[in-house]
């Protein structure tokens, strides 16, 4: 018997066969290269959407907490018995001053900031009476180096400025020396106090 030779594939059949042979390889490449990218993009989109929802949900809470903390700081330097209902917001534009309030009897508190160590802000709440005397201070130096710059937030440091007249600015050494090893933080507190004094003199004292 004569052995039949294999039938030669026509051109169209040959191309189809080659394409069929390549299909598994292309599918494998897609799974190995493209599919992970698609999955990663989908995950990123889902995470972004969840973060947006979370931010929308927490933003009002954060804002409320910030307002509560600021209110507590204002009240902490005012006479005992002062309440939130006694405070009136003051619109201020003095550089580095972030807020101010006054009371019906003429007391005022100015919130100011200054860059301390590594550029981190120190926040000061300075209370003034009707004569312009600095009656109380509160200093948030929690952003400064613990045990060094953070000491500027202790009353043993800033308490020396209580009783100072707003008729002149304060400076290191007059009446309080800088804390050893924390000159930058000490200067930040002084700068913030002086900003508060400027605000009081220019935007609160004598203004109805």
Language model segments and positions:
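Short, Lys/Arg-enriched N-terminal segments with co-localized hydrophobic residues
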Residues: 1-15
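Flexible, solvent-exposed loop/hinge segments and secondary-structure transition points
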Residues: 17-208
